[in-house]
């Protein structure tokens, strides 16, 4: 697992919360104090909780579990897309469509339509229709791709959800809770941690802080997958060796 230090969190600005007048009292246990009317998050609480989240993500990944990365606000989009793709996990980086999880069966039809349009674009079908029809198909494809490209290879509901800003993504979290999907969430001082299973108290606006969270989860997933793969290969070698001895 990637070794993250308190110094790295400080340098990334993880400890900076929101203005004190916007705070959520449920975040009181994670707040160190205030400075210039800004709440300061207690990194002595954040660091072990972040490591708990990394361990959970790693355990899931080692067993073949899928974690859906969710970050649709502007500072998070590119980082979520980059690191989710890097570790082979699905993601939502544009806009959370209502019912994306609770009505997943219908969403799968839209994914099938997207894949069909991609095939048509590649095999020359668009060239065989009128310019107006081709333009309409291209626009439909772009719209679906913008919303669904990160989950188009997700065959089933995820085993967990990782959310960068729990306030901004409250609809996604609500759907996850209805379905019993565990949530890993970055929770700033203006949000409630109540619906989050693995709370990461921290700044959810600074790009460096967001990158620390997202890259750390991705690294934990990659390391767990590699360890699982190596263990499986070692077990296979042992099995072959036993057979050879027996013969």
UniProtKB/Swiss-Prot annotation:
Transmembrane segments: none annotated. Signal peptide: none annotated. GO terms for cellular component: cytosolic small ribosomal subunit. GO terms for molecular function: structural constituent of ribosome. Pfam families: Ribosomal_S2. The keyword Ribosomal protein applies. Keywords: Ribonucleoprotein, Ribosomal protein. One of its GO terms (biological process) is translation. The keyword Transcription regulation does not apply. InterPro entries: Ribosomal_uS2, Ribosomal_uS2_bac/mit/plastid, Ribosomal_uS2_CS, Ribosomal_uS2_flav_dom_sf. It comes from the Bacteria. Belongs to the universal ribosomal protein uS2 family. This is Small ribosomal subunit protein uS2.
């Amino acid at each position: 697992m990637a070794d993250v230090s308190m110094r790295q969190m400080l340098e990334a600005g993880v400890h900076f919360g929101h203005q004190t007048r916007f705070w959520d009292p449920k975040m009181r246990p994670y707040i160190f104090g205030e400075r210039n009317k800004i709440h300061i998050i207690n990194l002595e609480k954040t660091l072990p909780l972040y490591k708990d989240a990394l361990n959970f993500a790693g355990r899931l990944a080692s067993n073949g579990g899928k974690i859906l990365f969710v970050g649709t606000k502007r500072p998070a989009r590119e980082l979520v897309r980059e690191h989710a793709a890097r570790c082979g996990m699905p993601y939502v980086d544009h806009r959370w469509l209502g019912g994306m999880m609770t009505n997943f069966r219908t969403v799968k039809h839209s994914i099938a339509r997207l894949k069909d349009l991609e095939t048509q674009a590649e095999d020359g079908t668009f060239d065989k229709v009128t310019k107006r029809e081709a333009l309409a198909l291209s626009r439909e494809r772009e719209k679906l791709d913008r919303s669904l490209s990160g989950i188009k290879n997700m065959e089933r509901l995820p085993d967990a959800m990782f959310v960068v800003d729990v306030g901004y993504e409250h609809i996604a979290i609500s759907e996850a809770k209805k379905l019993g999907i565990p949530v890993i969430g970055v929770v700033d001082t203006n949000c409630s941690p109540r619906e989050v299973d693995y709370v990461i108290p921290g700044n959810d606006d600074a790009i460096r802080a967001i990158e620390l969270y997202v890259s750390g989860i991705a690294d934990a997933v990659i390391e767990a997958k590699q360890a699982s793969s190596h263990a499986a290969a070692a077990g296979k070698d042992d099995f072959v060796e036993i057979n050879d001895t027996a013969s």
